Amino acid sequence: IYYTNHNTKNQLLNYILEDNRIDQVLLFARTKHGADRIVRNLKKQRIEAAAIHGDKSQNARQRALQQFKDYKIRVLVATDIASRGIDIDNLEYVINYDIPNESESYVHRIGRCGRAGDDGISISICGPEENEYIRDIEKLIKQKIEVVKDNPFPQTDRPMNAREKREFEKEKNRRRQEFFANRNRNRASSQRGGNR
C-alpha cells in the first residue's frame, strides 16, 4: 500500500506504471466519473487505457475487455459493479486507486489477480480520507497490509477527525447557501434593471 495525498494520487499512479514489469493492470475506481478521469489522465501520459462502468453500453464494456485481453490496452479501469462477472486469465496486477469503503469489495478486487495458482500483486493507493477503510480491511483479513516505504509522494495530510468533518460540512453548506442567495439576488437585480 502507498499512503499519499488525494491530490498526488495521479502522480503516484504514473510513477507506479513507469515500472515496465507491469505490462497490464486492472485498476479499480470508486465512481464512474472517477474511472473516466483516471483514463483521461493515463491517456495524457500515453498509456493505453479504457474504462468499464455502468454508464458504458454492454458493447463498449465487452470491447474494452476484449482489447485488454488482446493486450491492446495496458490499463482497464473498472468500478466494482462493472467488474463483477468478468474473468481475465493470467492477470498479475490489480491496483486499488480508490480504497473501497466495504472491506469485502477489497477481497473481491484482489482476488482478480493471481488466479489458478499464479502469483499476483495487489497495489493500493490510499489517501488520508481512506485510512479508516484500510483499518477495517486489515481487521477483516486479519493481517497488516505491507506499506511501501520508498514512496515518492508520501501522505502529509492527516485525515479529519469527526468534529473537523462536521465543521467542514457545516462551512461547505454555509458557503453553498451564500452562493445561491447571492446568485438569486443578482438575478433578481438584473431582471429589475432589465425591465426599465
Regions found by a protein language model. Name each.
Residues 1-159:
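Conserved helicase RecA-like core
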